[in-house]
Protein backbone atom coordinates (compact mmCIF):
# COMPACT_ATOMS: atom_id res chain seq x y z
CA UNK A 1 0.00 0.00 0.00
CA UNK A 2 2.88 2.39 0.73
CA UNK A 3 3.84 2.23 -2.97
CA UNK A 4 0.43 3.34 -4.24
CA UNK A 5 0.30 7.03 -5.14
CA UNK A 6 -2.25 9.18 -3.29
CA UNK A 7 -3.80 10.17 -6.62
CA UNK A 8 -5.47 6.76 -6.92
CA UNK A 9 -7.18 6.92 -3.52
CA UNK A 10 -9.73 9.47 -4.76
CA UNK A 11 -11.33 6.91 -7.07
CA UNK A 12 -13.76 4.15 -6.06
CA UNK A 13 -12.89 0.52 -6.86
CA UNK A 14 -13.25 -0.36 -10.52
CA UNK A 15 -16.43 -2.02 -11.74
CA UNK A 16 -16.07 -5.73 -10.82
CA UNK A 17 -16.94 -6.74 -14.38
CA UNK A 18 -13.65 -5.24 -15.58
CA UNK A 19 -11.58 -7.92 -13.87
CA UNK A 20 -13.09 -11.02 -15.53
CA UNK A 21 -13.03 -9.19 -18.87
CA UNK A 22 -9.34 -8.40 -18.42
CA UNK A 23 -8.70 -11.96 -17.23
CA UNK A 24 -10.33 -13.46 -20.34
CA UNK A 25 -8.42 -11.05 -22.57
CA UNK A 26 -5.12 -11.96 -20.92
CA UNK A 27 -5.92 -15.67 -21.15
CA UNK A 28 -6.56 -15.47 -24.90
CA UNK A 29 -3.64 -13.13 -25.53
CA UNK A 30 -1.28 -15.18 -23.37
CA UNK A 31 -2.05 -18.47 -25.11
CA UNK A 32 -1.81 -16.96 -28.59
CA UNK A 33 1.42 -15.14 -27.79
CA UNK A 34 3.21 -18.05 -26.12
CA UNK A 35 2.14 -20.52 -28.80
CA UNK A 36 2.83 -18.19 -31.72
CA UNK A 37 6.26 -17.06 -30.58
CA UNK A 38 7.29 -20.57 -29.54
CA UNK A 39 6.40 -21.88 -33.01
CA UNK A 40 8.28 -18.97 -34.61
CA UNK A 41 11.42 -19.72 -32.57
CA UNK A 42 11.14 -23.47 -33.20
CA UNK A 43 10.66 -23.10 -36.97
CA UNK A 44 13.54 -20.67 -37.43
CA UNK A 45 15.92 -22.66 -35.24
CA UNK A 46 15.08 -26.02 -36.83
CA UNK A 47 14.91 -25.02 -40.49
CA UNK A 48 18.41 -24.80 -41.92
CA UNK A 49 17.48 -22.48 -44.79
CA UNK A 50 16.03 -19.97 -42.30
CA UNK A 51 19.09 -19.84 -40.06
CA UNK A 52 20.44 -16.64 -41.61
CA UNK A 53 22.00 -13.64 -39.81
CA UNK A 54 18.95 -11.48 -40.53
CA UNK A 55 16.62 -14.10 -39.09
CA UNK A 56 18.59 -14.10 -35.84
CA UNK A 57 16.93 -10.73 -35.27
CA UNK A 58 13.53 -12.28 -35.95
CA UNK A 59 14.25 -15.00 -33.41
CA UNK A 60 15.36 -12.37 -30.89
CA UNK A 61 12.10 -10.50 -31.45
CA UNK A 62 10.11 -13.67 -30.86
CA UNK A 63 12.13 -14.44 -27.73
CA UNK A 64 11.55 -10.98 -26.25
CA UNK A 65 7.82 -11.23 -26.95
CA UNK A 66 7.69 -14.76 -25.52
CA UNK A 67 9.58 -13.69 -22.40
CA UNK A 68 7.29 -10.70 -21.94
CA UNK A 69 4.13 -12.78 -21.94
CA UNK A 70 5.73 -15.66 -20.00
CA UNK A 71 6.54 -13.29 -17.14
CA UNK A 72 3.47 -11.00 -17.41
CA UNK A 73 0.73 -13.56 -18.09
CA UNK A 74 0.60 -15.57 -14.80
CA UNK A 75 0.79 -12.55 -12.43
CA UNK A 76 -1.93 -10.74 -14.38
CA UNK A 77 -4.20 -13.78 -14.11
CA UNK A 78 -3.68 -13.89 -10.35
CA UNK A 79 -4.25 -10.19 -9.78
CA UNK A 80 -7.37 -10.16 -11.98
CA UNK A 81 -8.75 -13.07 -9.96
CA UNK A 82 -8.18 -11.29 -6.63
CA UNK A 83 -9.05 -7.81 -8.01
CA UNK A 84 -5.82 -6.34 -6.61
CA UNK A 85 -2.05 -6.81 -6.54
CA UNK A 86 -1.32 -9.63 -4.08
CA UNK A 87 2.25 -10.57 -4.98
CA UNK A 88 4.14 -8.12 -2.77
CA UNK A 89 6.29 -5.05 -3.29
CA UNK A 90 9.43 -6.85 -4.45
CA UNK A 91 7.70 -8.86 -7.15
CA UNK A 92 5.87 -5.71 -8.24
CA UNK A 93 9.24 -4.16 -9.04
CA UNK A 94 10.51 -7.30 -10.75
CA UNK A 95 7.30 -7.53 -12.78
CA UNK A 96 7.57 -3.93 -13.98
CA UNK A 97 11.28 -4.33 -14.74
CA UNK A 98 10.72 -7.41 -16.91
CA UNK A 99 7.85 -5.76 -18.77
CA UNK A 100 9.92 -2.68 -19.55
CA UNK A 101 12.98 -4.77 -20.46
CA UNK A 102 11.14 -6.97 -22.95
CA UNK A 103 9.29 -4.02 -24.46
CA UNK A 104 12.52 -2.07 -24.91
CA UNK A 105 14.30 -5.09 -26.43
CA UNK A 106 11.37 -5.69 -28.77
CA UNK A 107 11.29 -2.21 -30.26
CA UNK A 108 15.04 -1.95 -30.71
CA UNK A 109 15.10 -5.37 -32.36
CA UNK A 110 12.51 -4.03 -34.79
CA UNK A 111 14.69 -0.98 -35.39
CA UNK A 112 17.66 -3.18 -36.28
CA UNK A 113 15.47 -5.33 -38.55
CA UNK A 114 14.39 -2.13 -40.27
CA UNK A 115 18.00 -0.97 -40.59
CA UNK A 116 18.96 -4.33 -42.11
CA UNK A 117 16.17 -3.96 -44.69
CA UNK A 118 17.43 -0.44 -45.39
CA UNK A 119 20.95 -1.77 -45.91
CA UNK A 120 19.80 -4.53 -48.27
CA UNK A 121 17.31 -2.56 -50.36
CA UNK A 122 18.86 0.91 -50.51
CA UNK A 123 22.56 0.10 -50.57
CA UNK A 124 22.26 -3.25 -52.34
CA UNK A 125 25.57 -4.83 -53.31
CA UNK A 126 27.38 -1.70 -52.11
CA UNK A 127 26.20 -2.32 -48.55
CA UNK A 128 28.05 -4.54 -46.13
CA UNK A 129 26.09 -7.80 -45.77
CA UNK A 130 24.89 -8.73 -42.31
CA UNK A 131 27.05 -11.45 -40.82
CA UNK A 132 26.24 -13.80 -37.97
CA UNK A 133 28.88 -12.06 -35.86
CA UNK A 134 27.38 -8.61 -36.49
CA UNK A 135 23.81 -9.82 -35.87
CA UNK A 136 24.91 -11.40 -32.58
CA UNK A 137 26.67 -8.16 -31.60
CA UNK A 138 23.50 -6.20 -32.37
CA UNK A 139 21.43 -8.53 -30.21
CA UNK A 140 23.88 -8.30 -27.30
CA UNK A 141 23.86 -4.50 -27.60
CA UNK A 142 20.06 -4.45 -27.54
CA UNK A 143 19.84 -6.47 -24.33
CA UNK A 144 22.72 -4.73 -22.55
CA UNK A 145 21.38 -1.23 -23.25
CA UNK A 146 17.80 -2.26 -22.47
CA UNK A 147 18.88 -3.78 -19.16
CA UNK A 148 20.89 -0.67 -18.28
CA UNK A 149 17.91 1.64 -18.78
CA UNK A 150 15.37 -0.62 -17.09
CA UNK A 151 17.49 -1.36 -14.01
CA UNK A 152 17.89 2.37 -13.23
CA UNK A 153 14.67 2.63 -11.13
CA UNK A 154 16.12 0.07 -8.70
CA UNK A 155 18.82 2.64 -7.89
CA UNK A 156 16.57 5.63 -7.28
CA UNK A 157 16.16 7.09 -10.76
CA UNK A 158 12.36 6.88 -10.85
CA UNK A 159 10.80 3.74 -9.33
CA UNK A 160 8.47 0.86 -10.12
CA UNK A 161 5.03 1.12 -8.47
CA UNK A 162 1.55 -0.43 -8.76
CA UNK A 163 -0.64 0.91 -11.55
CA UNK A 164 -3.90 2.64 -10.70
CA UNK A 165 -5.95 -0.43 -11.59
CA UNK A 166 -3.87 -2.51 -9.11
CA UNK A 167 -3.51 -5.42 -11.53
CA UNK A 168 0.04 -4.62 -12.59
CA UNK A 169 3.07 -2.43 -11.99
CA UNK A 170 5.06 0.08 -14.01
CA UNK A 171 7.13 3.25 -13.84
CA UNK A 172 6.10 6.07 -11.50
CA UNK A 173 4.65 8.78 -13.75
CA UNK A 174 2.75 10.64 -11.00
CA UNK A 175 5.64 11.85 -8.84
CA UNK A 176 6.45 15.51 -9.53
CA UNK A 177 10.15 15.56 -8.59
CA UNK A 178 12.61 16.33 -11.35
CA UNK A 179 14.53 13.06 -10.83
CA UNK A 180 11.49 10.92 -11.58
CA UNK A 181 10.42 13.05 -14.51
CA UNK A 182 13.89 13.22 -16.03
CA UNK A 183 13.94 9.42 -16.25
CA UNK A 184 10.61 9.37 -18.08
CA UNK A 185 11.73 12.11 -20.48
CA UNK A 186 14.90 10.26 -21.42
CA UNK A 187 13.36 6.79 -21.38
CA UNK A 188 10.45 7.94 -23.59
CA UNK A 189 12.98 9.32 -26.04
CA UNK A 190 15.00 6.09 -25.94
CA UNK A 191 12.14 3.61 -26.38
CA UNK A 192 9.68 5.64 -28.45
CA UNK A 193 10.69 8.89 -30.12
CA UNK A 194 14.21 7.92 -31.27
CA UNK A 195 13.17 4.50 -32.65
CA UNK A 196 10.21 6.14 -34.38
CA UNK A 197 12.46 8.74 -36.00
CA UNK A 198 14.96 6.11 -37.18
CA UNK A 199 12.20 3.89 -38.53
CA UNK A 200 10.47 6.69 -40.42
CA UNK A 201 13.77 7.82 -41.95
CA UNK A 202 14.70 4.30 -43.07
CA UNK A 203 11.33 3.62 -44.66
CA UNK A 204 11.14 6.99 -46.40
CA UNK A 205 14.51 6.25 -48.01
CA UNK A 206 13.45 2.66 -48.80
CA UNK A 207 10.23 3.81 -50.48
CA UNK A 208 12.14 6.37 -52.55
CA UNK A 209 14.72 3.78 -53.59
CA UNK A 210 12.08 1.21 -54.56
CA UNK A 211 10.09 3.82 -56.50
CA UNK A 212 13.20 4.92 -58.39
CA UNK A 213 14.10 1.29 -59.14
CA UNK A 214 10.63 0.48 -60.45
CA UNK A 215 10.56 3.61 -62.61
CA UNK A 216 13.93 2.72 -64.08
CA UNK A 217 12.71 -0.79 -64.87
CA UNK A 218 9.59 0.54 -66.62
CA UNK A 219 11.52 3.11 -68.64
CA UNK A 220 14.05 0.54 -69.78
CA UNK A 221 11.31 -1.91 -70.73
CA UNK A 222 9.61 0.74 -72.88
CA UNK A 223 12.87 1.45 -74.69
CA UNK A 224 13.31 -2.25 -75.44
CA UNK A 225 9.66 -2.68 -76.45
CA UNK A 226 8.92 -5.40 -73.87
CA UNK A 227 6.54 -5.61 -70.94
CA UNK A 228 9.03 -6.35 -68.19
CA UNK A 229 12.71 -6.62 -67.43
CA UNK A 230 12.14 -8.88 -64.47
CA UNK A 231 14.93 -11.40 -64.03
CA UNK A 232 16.16 -13.43 -61.12
CA UNK A 233 17.90 -10.43 -59.54
CA UNK A 234 14.81 -8.26 -59.93
CA UNK A 235 12.64 -10.98 -58.40
CA UNK A 236 15.03 -11.12 -55.46
CA UNK A 237 14.76 -7.35 -55.06
CA UNK A 238 10.97 -7.68 -55.17
CA UNK A 239 11.14 -10.31 -52.42
CA UNK A 240 13.26 -7.98 -50.32
CA UNK A 241 10.65 -5.27 -50.80
CA UNK A 242 7.92 -7.61 -49.59
CA UNK A 243 9.99 -8.35 -46.50
CA UNK A 244 10.39 -4.64 -45.93
CA UNK A 245 6.61 -4.20 -46.06
CA UNK A 246 6.21 -6.97 -43.50
CA UNK A 247 8.78 -5.37 -41.21
CA UNK A 248 7.17 -1.95 -41.63
CA UNK A 249 3.75 -3.38 -40.74
CA UNK A 250 5.16 -5.02 -37.64
CA UNK A 251 6.83 -1.81 -36.48
CA UNK A 252 3.63 0.15 -37.11
CA UNK A 253 1.67 -2.34 -35.03
CA UNK A 254 4.24 -2.05 -32.26
CA UNK A 255 3.87 1.72 -32.10
CA UNK A 256 0.08 1.44 -32.14
CA UNK A 257 0.38 -0.99 -29.24
CA UNK A 258 2.70 1.15 -27.11
CA UNK A 259 1.37 4.65 -27.86
CA UNK A 260 -1.49 4.34 -25.33
CA UNK A 261 0.97 3.45 -22.56
CA UNK A 262 3.20 6.38 -23.51
CA UNK A 263 0.19 8.71 -23.42
CA UNK A 264 -0.79 7.39 -19.99
CA UNK A 265 2.70 8.22 -18.72
CA UNK A 266 2.64 11.74 -20.14
CA UNK A 267 -0.92 12.45 -19.03
CA UNK A 268 0.13 11.26 -15.58
CA UNK A 269 2.97 13.78 -15.59
CA UNK A 270 1.15 16.81 -16.97
CA UNK A 271 -2.62 16.30 -16.61
CA UNK A 272 -3.16 13.58 -14.05
CA UNK A 273 -6.62 14.88 -13.11
CA UNK A 274 -7.80 13.25 -16.36
CA UNK A 275 -6.25 9.90 -15.49
CA UNK A 276 -8.44 7.30 -13.77
CA UNK A 277 -7.63 3.65 -12.95
CA UNK A 278 -9.85 2.45 -15.80
CA UNK A 279 -7.84 4.41 -18.37
CA UNK A 280 -4.63 2.71 -17.28
CA UNK A 281 -6.08 -0.64 -18.37
CA UNK A 282 -5.93 0.45 -22.02
CA UNK A 283 -2.17 0.64 -21.81
CA UNK A 284 -2.13 -3.03 -20.79
CA UNK A 285 -4.60 -4.11 -23.46
CA UNK A 286 -2.68 -2.57 -26.36
CA UNK A 287 0.82 -3.34 -25.06
CA UNK A 288 0.16 -7.01 -24.31
CA UNK A 289 -1.62 -7.52 -27.63
CA UNK A 290 1.57 -6.40 -29.38
CA UNK A 291 3.32 -9.62 -28.42
CA UNK A 292 0.75 -11.54 -30.50
CA UNK A 293 1.24 -9.53 -33.71
CA UNK A 294 4.80 -10.41 -34.63
CA UNK A 295 4.58 -14.22 -35.04
CA UNK A 296 1.39 -13.80 -37.09
CA UNK A 297 3.02 -11.30 -39.45
CA UNK A 298 6.18 -13.36 -39.92
CA UNK A 299 4.22 -16.61 -40.33
CA UNK A 300 2.41 -15.00 -43.27
CA UNK A 301 5.77 -14.14 -44.82
UniProtKB/Swiss-Prot annotation:
It is a multi-pass membrane protein. GO terms for molecular function: G protein-coupled receptor activity; photoreceptor activity. PROSITE patterns: G_PROTEIN_RECEP_F1_1, G_PROTEIN_RECEP_F1_2, OPSIN. A motif ('Ionic lock' involved in activated form stabilization) lies at residues 116-118. GO terms for cellular component: cell projection; plasma membrane. It is found in: Cell projection, Rhabdomere membrane. GO terms for biological process: phototransduction; visual perception. Residues 44-55, 116-134, 205-245 are cytoplasmic. The chain crosses the membrane at residues 19-43, 56-78, 93-115, 135-155, 183-204, 246-267, 279-300. Contains one covalently linked retinal chromophore. The keyword Kinase does not apply. Keywords: Cell membrane, Cell projection, Chromophore, Disulfide bond, G-protein coupled receptor, Glycoprotein, Membrane, Phosphoprotein, Photoreceptor protein, Receptor, Retinal protein, Sensory transduction, Transducer, Transmembrane, Transmembrane helix, Vision. The modification N6-(retinylidene)lysine is found at residue 288. The keyword Cytoplasm does not apply. It holds the Pfam family 7tm_1. Glycans are attached at residue 165. Its main location: membrane. Residues 1-18, 79-92, 156-182, 268-278 are extracellular. Gene3D superfamilies: Rhodopsin 7-helix transmembrane proteins. Disulfide bonds join 92-169. Belongs to the G-protein coupled receptor 1 family. Opsin subfamily. Homodimer. Interacts with GNAQ. Photoreceptor required for image-forming vision at low light intensity. Can use both retinal and 3-dehydroretinal as visual pigment. Light-induced isomerization of 11-cis to all-trans retinal triggers a conformational change that activates signaling via G-proteins. Signaling via GNAQ probably mediates the activation of phospholipase C. This is Rhodopsin. It comes from Orconectes australis.
